């Protein structure tokens, strides 16, 4: 809605100088829709990115130097859909001794999409096994688009959040890390009613008995053609709930199902259009927000995107950068 846009523009202008700049990065700092995880055995960092069979980079610290290690699935996915050799939006988790990586098979503007999964014991290139589709799939008749997966466990239950544009963000219960639960029906957890519903990249995490739902909004791509109007570029927002399955509201109590969302990070200084975010619970730095952004000192094309990260600060159980 128009009011939603005005609120975000106001918040963006008010916070333009309030954010900390991204933490240092050296080596291979390119990324797009990053997935980030710290290996349990030795603390080594692995960063995954959209493109090809999912790019892998690794480093001994968040600051780098990051090395390019190849791909998760060099030949692409076994899911037979357009986009199977150009996989998107990796999401990582660790469960019972195994690392799981969710990825999306789709193409721009299409709802012919599926969420696939690969597993590894180490996260190293060459160690991944593709299991194909999780059963989370969409077609043009679906109310959602099954990309941008994000896993969370609550007690003995596992869930995957997903969605982009259309009716935005949904959640479905999983049988295990590989397959959706039989008979489970996705339910909506967030919706932006304005315009063409620019909302995607759900990432949920838990802290102090709250579940936080972060997501990206605004215009994600096309900066190499033109700059969007100020405030219309990618940004990161957050809502929270005492339940992982719904009831998310922003700082003002506005429901995430009714265009709610408190701004967490937007363009500032040399950082333009941050998004595609996730949260790492780092062994030494605590909760770390990671994302991609266009560095205005380098370029605005996807090929120029950079890896950004910031330690989160907390006030009244709300995160800030």
From Swiss-Prot:
EC nos: 3.2.1.99
Localization terms from the record: Secreted
Reactions that this protein is recorded to catalyse: Endohydrolysis of (1->5)-alpha-arabinofuranosidic linkages in (1->5)-arabinans
Pfam family, one: Glyco_hydro_43
An annotated Gene Ontology molecular function: arabinan endo-1,5-alpha-L-arabinosidase activity
Gene3D superfamilies per the UniProt record, alphabetical: Glycosyl hydrolase domain, family 43 (2.115.10.20)
Origin: domain of life: Eukaryota
The keyword Zinc-finger belongs to this UniProt entry's keyword annotation: no
Site, as annotated: Important for catalytic activity, responsible for pKa modulation of the active site Glu and correct orientation of both the proton donor and substrate: 148
SUPFAM superfamilies: Arabinanase/levansucrase/invertase
Pathway(s) it belongs to: Glycan metabolism; L-arabinan degradation
Principal location listed in the UniProt entry: secreted
Glycosylation sites: 192, 224
Entry's Gene Ontology cellular component terms: extracellular region
Annotated active site: 33, 200
Signal sequence coordinates: 1-18
UniProt record, GO biological process: arabinan catabolic process; xylan catabolic process
Keywords carried by this UniProt record: Carbohydrate metabolism, Glycoprotein, Glycosidase, Hydrolase, Polysaccharide degradation, Secreted, Signal, Xylan degradation
Record keyword Secreted present: yes
Role according to the record: Endo-1,5-alpha-L-arabinanase involved in degradation of pectin. Its preferred substrate is linear 1,5-alpha-L-arabinan.
PANTHER family referenced in this protein's UniProt entry, alphabetically: ARABINAN ENDO-1,5-ALPHA-L-ARABINOSIDASE, ARABINAN ENDO-1,5-ALPHA-L-ARABINOSIDASE C
Family listed: Belongs to the glycosyl hydrolase 43 family.
Protein name as annotated: Probable arabinan endo-1,5-alpha-L-arabinosidase C
Gene name of the encoded protein: abnC
